[in-house]
Amino acid sequence: MKRLIAILFVGIVALAASGFCHAQFSKLSFGKYGVSSIRPESLRAVRGAVWIDVTNPMEGFTVSEIKGTVYKHGVAFVHGEASDVYIPSGSGRAVISGRASLSSSASLWDVLALIAFDPEDYSVDLSVRITLDSGETRVVSKTRMPVAALLKLI
């Protein structure tokens, strides 16, 4: 589960990077990651926070209006949204907190199946707003990004 959460975090930052033609975005790199907290909100929803070490060779930027859906075999599995996160210039630890809830088509048994997590089974829709420190802003959306491809970024 920790790995899936970190993959989604990388997906958010990678999506932000793809939204600009800035050559330095391709030089973003990710290091250690972990879960800061997970708190059940109900049987079908959790709140939590994750951290990841990021090396950002360009100006800092804010990722906001973060929303997404995880699909398992093409069927909506989890819906989520997260608070704004700032990725500073240089190296540092970025923390993102948010809420995730099972979609109506998912069962609690599906959550137990995460024990045998296979990234080939999952894809992600993400939408974010990116604001560079210089003030330039762009909204970027991607649909059905394979989780297996996001794994290659970690």
Language model: regions and residue ranges:
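Conserved aromatic beta-strand anchor motif in extracellular beta-sandwich/beta-rich domains
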Residues: 70-72
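Short solvent-exposed capping/turn motifs at the termini of beta-strands
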Residues: 54-56
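Intrinsically disordered, low-complexity Pro/Gly/Ser/Thr-rich segments with frequent PxxP/GP/PP motifs
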Residues: 74-110
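Bacterial N-terminal signal peptides
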Residues: 8-16
